[in-house]
Design a protein with these regions (language model features):
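Active-site diphosphate/adenylate-binding microenvironment
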Residues: 1-74
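Thiamine diphosphate
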Residues: 42-177
Length: 177
């Protein structure tokens, strides 16, 4: 099961696969910052740590939107380390105005949006406990790449597995956000 989540050969990109590739490309040295939801579950499960104080998360508090401002803080608290932020589309919409702070301060946050077009964790609970009675879980998302570029932040949308390694390499090697 774990190998299918980390090394799929077909189908759409999986959250575990993306997290695993980012942690490998960062040399297992980065600070992980997560939001709330499925992205948090996958990031905490598959991100590998080699140093203490390498994870910033709100735990089970349910604070959607936590990741972006927390990642900004992590860049100030540990300026010598790479900060990788994993966030879902729902959480990013809660605090994406902080992209302005990232632009202003040139915070070198490496932002990875795991966009599944749902409030994924909420939908999962509706499947498990509410007989698949879905309520307000699909997301009508804006063009996140365009928004980031509007703030002067380099951005790239990746949906093809063949592009993933190069996109991560560019993300981690680009100075600034």
């Amino acid at each position: 099961m774990i190998s299918k989540a980390l090394y799929p050969t077909e189908g759409p990109l999986l959250m575990g696969e993306v997290v695993n590739k980012v942690t490998e490309a960062s040399g297992n040295e980065a600070i992980l910052v997560t939001d709330v939801g499925q992205n948090q579950l996958f990031a905490c499960r598959y991100f590998k740590f080699t140093k203490p104080r390498s994870i910033v998360t709100s735990g089970g508090m349910g604070t959607m939107g936590f990741a972006l401002p927390a990642a900004i803080g992590a860049t100030f608290g540990a300026p010598e380390r790479t900060v990788c932020m994993f966030c879902g589309d729902g959480g990013l919409q809660m605090t994406m105005q902080e992209l302005g702070t990232i632009m202003e301060q040139q915070c070198p946050v490496k932002m990875i949006l795991l966009n599944n077009n749902y409030l994924g964790n909420v939908r999962q609970w509706q499947e498990m406990f509410f007989n698949r009675r879905y309520s307000f879980t699909p997301m009508a998302n804006p063009d996140y790449e365009l928004i980031a570029k509007g703030y002067g932040i380099p951005a790239r949308t990746v949906v093809d597995r063949a592009e993933l390694d190069d996109a991560i390499r560019v993300l981690l090697s680009t100075p600034g956000p």
